[in-house]
């Protein structure tokens, strides 16, 4: 497996050549399509580990033979490094670790990706991701067929004691939730359908200002659910003024406030934003191979890229966003310059641009931003 390397202070991170499409999609498409506009840089190709021109068919054949587990293990290793470097960088309203778990489906054409299976008339793969909310980094990822139900992979999550796990209603599986409770972890999950239960304790708590409508301790009485989850559960009804909708949450934590439970669920959107970022800025919609191996390799390469960019952002570019760092890297792969020097000059330019925007804005309008409790 060919690699290029990025050095961040005393650490060197080898990056698979398969990650180049994520780092620089424009350059890669030109290279693969045989466009000659990169001819002046041909003597610099060795810097990227390239030899002769790479065709799409050659890359497809190579990825067909490669074992995606190598890329999976490397992605998980970079995830571990990125989480370690970002831990404690941001203040959070709760001291426990908080994770949001969800999946995103990458649609594939069944006639081309023949190994996929139909699910609701569509074929594709699912990327199931456990997202570290406090550190804005994925902590676990697994790829399955689109036909696999979300709750079926809950038993593969590496649960941590005293940590919170936030789930959407697709994960309202009482058997899996009870397994989380047995580990000593906490969950917050949205109600999927009306549950059959009896009230054990009604806290008679109602706060229209924050949206909490009720906070009760219940016991499931359904024929199946009472066997799968025999302990009391906390049920919170919350009204969201912004969306004009009522939500029902279940949790096994009885200590945090009802408002905090609702706020924790709002942070579930962080994993949705991560999926949106990945699909928008990294190449996981167009694949260079049609086999299952090729698809998995490219998805894991994209996750590797995200983690690498996050590490560089944390170590060298605190004033820049993850996307801004990605843009700099994608346009500078053929530039032989120390990363710190490259990013430092970019940060200075960004600060000047921001100052100019603030000055121009203040000339014409004075913004009043209301305090939003939520």
Region annotations inferred by a language model:
Residues 1-36, 49-52, 63-66, 70-82, ...:
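Single, function-defining residue in the core of a domain
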Residues 39:
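Alpha-helical residues within the helix-turn-helix
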Residues 42-57:
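Short, basic interhelical loop/turn and adjoining N-cap
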Residues 116-117:
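Extracellular beta-strand-rich solenoid/capping regions of secreted or surface-exposed proteins
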